[in-house]
Curated annotation (Swiss-Prot):
This is Glutamate receptor ionotropic, delta-2. It comes from Rattus norvegicus. GO terms for biological process: cerebellar granule cell differentiation; excitatory postsynaptic potential; excitatory synapse assembly; heterophilic cell-cell adhesion via plasma membrane cell adhesion molecules; modulation of chemical synaptic transmission; positive regulation of long-term synaptic depression; positive regulation of synapse assembly; prepulse inhibition. It is found in: Postsynaptic cell membrane. The keyword Ion transport applies. The modification Phosphoserine is found at S883, S890, S1006. The record marks F76 as: Essential for dimerization.
Amino acid sequence: MEVFPLLFFLSFWWSRTWDLATSDSIIHIGAIFDESAKKDDEVFRTAVGDLNQNEEILQTEKITFSVTFVDGNNPFQAVQEACELMNQGILALVSSIGCTSAGSLQSLADAMHIPHLFIQRSTAGTPRSGCGLTRSNRNDDYTLSVRPPVYLNEVILRVVTEYAWQKFIIFYDSEYDIRGIQEFLDKVSQQGMDVALQKVENNINKMITTLFDTMRIEELNRYRDTLRRAILVMNPATAKSFISEVVETNLVAFDCHWIIINEEINDVDVQELVRRSIGRLTIIRQTFPVPQNISQRCFRGNHRISSTLCDPKDPFAQNMEISNLYIYDTVLLLANAFHKKLEDRKWHSMASLSCIRKNSKPWQGGRSMLETIKKGGVNGLTGDLEFGENGGNPNVHFEILGTNYGEELGRGVRKLGCWNPVTGLNGSLTDKKLENNMRGVVLRVVTVLEEPFVMVSENVLGKPKKYQGFSIDVLDALSNYLGFNYEIYVAPDHKYGSPQEDGTWNGLVGELVFKRADIGISALTITPDRENVVDFTTRYMDYSVGVLLRRAEKTVDMFACLAPFDLSLWACIAGTVLLVGLLVYLLNWLNPPRLQMGSMTSTTLYNSMWFVYGSFVQQGGEVPYTTLATRMMMGAWWLFALIVISSYTANLAAFLTITRIESSIQSLQDLSKQTDIPYGTVLDSAVYQHVRMKGLNPFERDSMYSQMWRMINRSNGSENNVLESQAGIQKVKYGNYAFVWDAAVLEYVAINDPDCSFYTVGNTVADRGYGIALQHGSPYRDVFSQRILELQQSGDMDILKHKWWPKNGQCDLYSSVDAKQKGGALDIKSLAGVFCILAAGIVLSCLIAVLETWWSRRKGSRVPSKEDDKEIDLEHLHRRVNSLCTDDDSPHKQFSTSSIDLTPLDIDTLPTRQALEQISDFRNTHITTTTFIPEQIQTLSRTLSAKAASGFTFGSVPEHRTGPFRHRAPNGGFFRSPIKTMSSIPYQPTPTLGLNLGNDPDRGTSI
């Protein structure tokens, strides 16, 4: 190690001596390097020293050189320094600068006919972008590109296609020109790939901190999902720092797969990148052939290379850049070209050229020297160095390295393949474990029962259980395509898995962590915590959180007929009926109406109330009201009744035909705002952890999850949460409860419920998905993911979904009202109240009838005389016999015999209680009556019917018989005599011809 500085110093001093003694040599070359490329200068001087010591190439001639440093992005300075070198006299110009200055030197070299060997240099080890130097069709292009063209676009596209990536992100550092991969971006866009770009700033820690400060939890989760597939286009130092930051901040998980592409990656960088990364890592770098014989590594033909450059164990050789290697080979190529010119004796002496003078001529030997260089070729540190017709070096090889599956942190790498522009990819990037397919492989599958993902279809004693469901269908599709078989069992604790206090995992995830199962499948969601311990395939179904609620049942209200009006309104209507009835009675009492002859009605309070009620229910009334005040009152009342009854009828129809029982909970936001319905989820599940994480996040702007967490975490989660999803579903069905769970599971339950008693609400944003879990580092993850993507693109996955979640199910998922309740014929429950009112009326009327009968019999028992019964029955006869006079001037009026006219009375039409006694009781032709006058009796002549008259014995009445009938009250009015004096009234038959005049109101019956 101490010898190297001494040798390097001696070599530098020796080469520098030749630099000063330019007048003693005929070989002089100029070099222009970027001021930051000090190592290029060191290697250049080492190469000149090695060649000057090799007497077989230049024999006695020695190479002298002049080196100058410029700003790589300052074309004017580069041209100025090149002119100084040409003025000294040079055979060739070697440059290791950026593309901006290279274009200016190209124009100068073409003008002065000086061969220009350009080695493109990348800034700080950043991947190169194409320089795009203008190439003329003529043979006067004196610039030769030593480094091969940039093939990063072709290599990345081939690798990404081999891995079947459909979505990934590209990170590039601030020094990289993104236009270098424009061709790649165009091609992947045409193939339908989803590609994102992100620039990595120099301060990586600040950039990561900004991400956490500006992104919400959902955005960070989506960002983590994007980072699962990434391409890093940056220098090795930046790549190592970036990987360390994202790993420490938990932005990537063990299932990530990153590709790093850079020509400048050396062996030391590879080991460091693998050590810092997690997951799978693929490295693409430019490689150079190395002799298999260790003793020949420092020999190239007849030339011996300095051991500091060819020994892989030498620190200087380990840290050399690719541009250093090409500079050494460039000097070697020029030395061989000079040797060829000297050997052919076609040497052209150097000339001092001036770039400033207008009449300056180019070098005459420039064309010959250029052709000699282009036709020559050497085998150096970069392999074969030669030039094609376009002046470029076509020889380039890329090496593809990758980490093996199943290796732990700090794992090694192996060579997966190589790529070159001629043959393309040589090798396979797939894991060797899957090269022979999966025929004969038996996988042990762990699951959790969850409808409709995994369900037991057959359970026969002594035989393995058979399972069915959506996840089982997906697993069968993978099995049929890849050819593997599987054995399935249920997780012992029937849980999906969550981290425990001691750092271990339980449930399905725990079975994978402890390697008791190969894969796990069910309604298993992809979460960041789970991705830290197991691998996941790409999602095969989107996931969202939903809420299961019970539909509002149609309550059996026997008095639904009263529902259209509020209780207060019913009370107002009842009070209005009583008030209007009372007002009608008072108006008639103050201004009694003049009733027509023969009217049997009376305007009592009872009749007024009955009339108002009858008109209200649109059944009419019996009392005619003729006064203007009463009619005005009744007109307003009828208008009021019309509006009220119409409104009632319309509302009753709406209440009985369309049940409006809508729930107020239609979203997660509504659920979080209310406290009447308790809600919860499965304890320690992904939903539970999801709500907890968001509810306790101080940076969460939405307070919805904070409110939900307060409800779910009551009594440390034991009050409102359940241990299994089935318990939560049963709790919803038979209690006042809302179950927060996977929307897909809840939708299946709601669709297939026999009573259609459930409905679901939730968000439509699918921020996560269901995936198949595998052991960390499993070789089956990528092949499973690729097949899942194929199922989704072909539409087969949608067919499987429709099998378990049909579009037209028997139940409506999202309506809080049963479809059967929305319309249809009315049932007995709808009108039960009407029947109850009718039954109450019937029972009440029967009770009143019994009471009236009892009262009548009790009253009749106090007048046991049969004659008194006849008097009571004859009261109705007196009302219909027009034989009483109300004239106040004749209290004891005597009636003539000719005026006696008993109106025939149709006895058959009278009710039993009012019918006359048998005609045989009146054989003595005398009618026994009482001496009272009923109130308001009218003078109306009636005629007895023939049947009634046939029962009487008509005889000649020689004289008119009289008897006491009426009494004058002390006040001059008539009143019923308190003493019912029995008197005989002789019956006087009416001639036959006079029967048709019985209805004459002017005639009466003489008594």
